[in-house]
Amino acid sequence: MTILLLIVIYIAFIGLGVPDSLIGSAWPAIYPEFGIPVDSVSCVTLLVSGCTVLSSMFSDRLLNRFGTAKVTVFSTAMTALALLGFSVSNRFVFLCLLAIPLGLGAGAIDSGLNNYIALHYSASHMNFLHCFYGIGVSASPYLMSLALAENTWREGYRSAFLVQICITAILLFSLPLWKKSSAKAQESTEEVAPQTLSLKQMWQMPEVRTVWVIMLATNAIEYACGTWGSTWLVEGRGFTPENAAFMITLYYAGMALGRFLSGILANRVSTWKRIGIGILGVLIAVAVLPFSAIGLFLVGLGNGSIYPNLIHLTPVNFGESVSQSIMGSQIATAYLGVMVAPPLFGLVSNLLGIQVFPWFLIVLFVIMTVFIGIFVRQLKVSGRYDKTA
């Protein structure tokens, strides 16, 4: 029963990844058709991320009231309908409106499933969970590259909708499975009463403030690559839109591979050591990226494992009773990075040119690395650092 539920959760995380990489791959074809500036993509990503932040911040209340299973089904269905709307939109304002349900659905899925896995499964399962997210975001630009080869980005969104609606159906039919697994868990383990923390209470915890910055930075790296990588390759490196979309597929494939390898190593190498390996991987990637597009694959490979490993440490670092509140806040700040990085680079590229994209990633990498060091020191001082976790 536990294994079947785990498979369902993995499938749900494919659904979480499906919408995230589409806009970046499709944008080189969308903005000329709509006759809008290239940096208008930031409006869409800003709305998606902002709604994801709101959804994540209130996720503990929603999940405690309706349960992880029902929230996940409803949220996945909502994102599927939004993707269908994208495929038929003929004005930019409609893309912006449809970004709202896309973001609201993503935040609830992300917060609920991450905390569920962190509490009930091992670190390897957490990495494999995010590996399946990587499968979702890898499949989407591949589908989009096929659509762009036929000169129609709309078909890419329609294909993504079909994938998402099938995942919704699987989740809907799995609802009885969640109930059985929940009852079994209550019989076999002593449940820790969840404690809801306010934003003010979390802000007063120095370790929480630090991990917020880390989450912001690592996700800013991830989504800056996903949103602007294709445009950088087209306008800065002379790639065709379909070849650029394929390279973004490789970027997300690298992210999935990094998480898969981290999951394989989970039983042999501690979580903190795997985070260190990821940091080293990103260091190599940002050194290569100014000279070769293969650096995008390496960024995904290294950065991909940092986020899920930090997420899995949430109950260890802060305690199981408050993990859902802090999990939601971490994911909210992660999406602040998603929300801020694309429009920020849009401004930077307008001022300095698209060619500075690799250097933008280097700055984000330095911020992330410095604050991970601060976080480890804070945990050691408070006695919460577990190097064997």
Name what the model sees in each region:
Residues 23-24, 206-249, 253-256:
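Extracytoplasmic gate region of multi-pass secondary transporters
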Residues 35, 67, 88-93, 238, ...:
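Helix-breaking motifs and short loop linkers at transmembrane-helix boundaries and internal kinks
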Residues 54-93:
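Conserved MFS/SLC helix-loop-helix module at the cytosolic interface between two early adjacent transmembrane helices
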Residues 55-68, 148, 258-271, 349-350:
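Helix-to-loop junctions at the C-terminal end of transmembrane segments
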Residues 98-132:
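Cytoplasmic helix-loop-helix junction between adjacent transmembrane helices
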Residues 269-313:
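C-terminal transmembrane helical hairpin of 12-TM major facilitator-type secondary transporters
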Residues 318-354:
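A late C-terminal transmembrane helix in Major Facilitator Superfamily
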